[in-house]
Amino acid sequence: MKRDDLIFDIIEKEHQRQLKGIELIASENFVSDQVMQAMGSCLTNKYAEGYPGKRYYGGCEVVDQSEQIAIDRLKEIFGAEWANVQPHSGAQANAAVFLAVLNPGDKFMGLNLAHGGHLSHGSLVNTSGIIYTPCEYNLNQETGRVDYDQMEEVALREKPKMIIGGGSAYSREWDYKRMREIADKVGAILMIDMAHPAGLIAAGLLENPVKYAHIVTSTTHKTLRGPRGGVIMMGKDFPNPWGKKTPKGEIKMMSQLLDSAVFPGVQGGPLEHVIAAKAVAFGEILQPEYKEYAKQVQKNAAILAQALIDRGFTIVSGGTDNHSMLVDLRSKYPDLTGKVAEKALVSADITVNKNMVPFDSRSAFQTSGIRLGTPAITTRGAKEDLMIEIAEMIETVLSNVENEEVIAQVRARVNETMKKYPLFAD
């Protein structure tokens, strides 16, 4: 068979882009060679609808083993009693939880998207906001942190069936205990989407929501440094509170509802090559080296945030507890949009994403902020000194967004600097 040079040349171009640049998108990371090998394995050939030991296809004895290893390792990492590793993405995991917990039109509550929430937590352009009825809680305008008193007020007023914690652009620790107390007051299911900080939670650097939430979802890339995918967990399984029964008249456990919501509810056959890669990544997380990596991610984020603050940038909430930060450009560059900032930085081979900030007057296509994160650059071996240098380069670019000569100089500096850093530093 003739090699498809058109596609493989594109793949090599992307490889070079990743090698030469500084990756600061908070949701991105670089996987190890063995995770990559598992994703590119012959397991992609196997259809395996169902779950280990209960498949709708023959010949699943081998993939049953790799999927069960993924389940067992994930449960060990987070202290969960039950886990499902089949969701193709974090959004798919969330959609499955919605299907298991809510009926069409049911009310639920999540963090305002413009304040750092996620599309799958109730955006009106997402199925979560189309099929179900969202209400939202916000950040405190003064502190830039989740306003738990306001969250409780909204919950008591709206009586949501489910409350969601977690977001895509929130740099602070969550008070899961308080959230569970609020959920219990209104009889709501508490779902925590820990997609962003999951790796720091796995390393014991942040509070573990599995101890407090009814249901926890996550992606498997980002700080977990695995393949792109999703998972669902419960600290303790429990009988579903709505009295849904099996054909034999027994009350279904919540795990049964969640398993059915993943398959056949929102997905068909699982991606067993990706699940094997998840298992490999989970095995890496269980090694002592991973905790050191996670500590460095957290250190690098704190140093980068402070270096930017020292240069006059505003960080929403004043800093970070995790791997990420949201930079509000309005104080330092009132006329600069996140869109223009992103384009200028990408031209300098510093990859970031534009992001709305709390109480933003600009649209999601323009924005007044950029989001930064340190998981990927830390995987490459970066330490605190490079964070200081990155802050300097960001300021240089954003002070010269229309000066192609300055941007070219920064790009050359970035490319030269990154020659010292492999994509995955052992």
From Swiss-Prot:
Residues that bind (6S)-5,6,7,8-tetrahydrofolate: 113, 117-119, 363-365
Catalytic activity, as annotated: (6R)-5,10-methylene-5,6,7,8-tetrahydrofolate + glycine + H2O = (6S)-5,6,7,8-tetrahydrofolate + L-serine
**What is the purpose of this protein?**
Catalyzes the reversible interconversion of serine and glycine with tetrahydrofolate (THF) serving as the one-carbon carrier. This reaction serves as the major source of one-carbon groups required for the biosynthesis of purines, thymidylate, methionine, and other important biomolecules. Also exhibits THF-independent aldolase activity toward beta-hydroxyamino acids, producing glycine and aldehydes, via a retro-aldol mechanism.
Site entry (Plays an important role in substrate specificity), positions: 221
Please name the source species.
Answer: Bacteroides thetaiotaomicron (strain ATCC 29148 / DSM 2079 / JCM 5827 / CCUG 10774 / NCTC 10582 / VPI-5482 / E50)
Q: What CDD domains has UniProt attached to this entry? A: SHMT
Q: Which gene encodes it?
A: glyA
The protein's matches in Gene3D superfamilies, at most eight in alphabetical order, are given as: Aspartate Aminotransferase, domain 1 (3.90.1150.10), Type I PLP-dependent aspartate aminotransferase-like (Major domain) (3.40.640.10)
Q: Where in the cell is it found?
A: Cytoplasm
Name the Enzyme Commission number(s) assigned to this protein: 2.1.2.1
Q: What is this protein called?
A: Serine hydroxymethyltransferase
Q: Keyword set for this entry? A: Amino-acid biosynthesis, Cytoplasm, One-carbon metabolism, Pyridoxal phosphate, Transferase
Which residues are in coiled coils?
none
| GO cellular component entries | cytoplasm; cytosol
Q: Which cofactor does it need?
A: pyridoxal 5'-phosphate
Which terms in the Gene Ontology molecular function aspect does this entry carry?
glycine hydroxymethyltransferase activity; pyridoxal phosphate binding
User: Can you tell which superkingdom this protein's organism belongs to?
Assistant: Bacteria
Q: Which residues carry this modification: N6-(pyridoxal phosphate)lysine?
A: 222
* Subunit comment: Homodimer.
NCBIfam families annotated for this entry?
PRK00011.1
Pathway info? One-carbon metabolism; tetrahydrofolate interconversion; Amino-acid biosynthesis; glycine biosynthesis; glycine from L-serine: step 1/1
Instruction: Give the family this protein belongs to, as stated in its UniProt record.
Output: Belongs to the SHMT family.
Any one of the GO BP annotations = tetrahydrofolate metabolic process
